[in-house]
Amino acid sequence: ATNAFVPDYLRSTGQSEWIGAALSGLNVGQLPASFLLLAFADHLERKTWPYIVCGLLCVIATVGIVFGAGVWVLAATTLQGFAASAILILVLALPPLLSRPDDVHRVTAAMFTISYSCAVIVPVISGLAWDLTGVAKTAFLPIALCGILLVILAPAINHIPRTGS
């Protein structure tokens, strides 16, 4: 959702010159997240704190986008790209960690259904918030709320213990 609203938001705040850099930051920020999660996968697996940290990073980045200017917007969008990528990777790793081997396909299907539904509805809600209030910053409220929701729900993740290892 962030990449959909950043260009218009920056235009509305008189920061059009930062659009290209901000969108690049969103994409470039994804790369270190992928490499870090790969490098530390064994240390992050079955832990709750990575989800909480990523949720907090999402909220911090969203606040930075909304209240920052210039290079701070670039830093915030890069952080948002990092957090969003890390969240996606962590969530995609959940089905085999949450379910018995014979249920992985069902849990995966459910998670993809829920995650793609959210990926569609959050931008709609964000656009609606902006349209109804006429305040550009409100478009980012649903995005920040997703980060807060992740922080709240992360402790409820109940991993299935490993057997036979």
Language-model segments: residues:
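Helix-to-loop junctions at the C-terminal end of transmembrane segments
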Residues: 33-46, 130
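Multi-pass alpha-helical transporter architecture, strongest
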Residues: 141-165
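Hydrophobic/aromatic end-of-helix segments at the C-terminal termini of transmembrane alpha-helices
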Residues: 2-10, 91, 95, 125
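C-terminal transmembrane helical hairpin of 12-TM major facilitator-type secondary transporters
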Residues: 45-94
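Helix-to-coil boundary motifs at intracellular loop junctions of multi-pass secondary transporters
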Residues: 9-13, 43-44, 94-101, 132
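A late C-terminal transmembrane helix in Major Facilitator Superfamily
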Residues: 98-135, 143
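Extracytoplasmic gate region of multi-pass secondary transporters
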Residues: 1-34
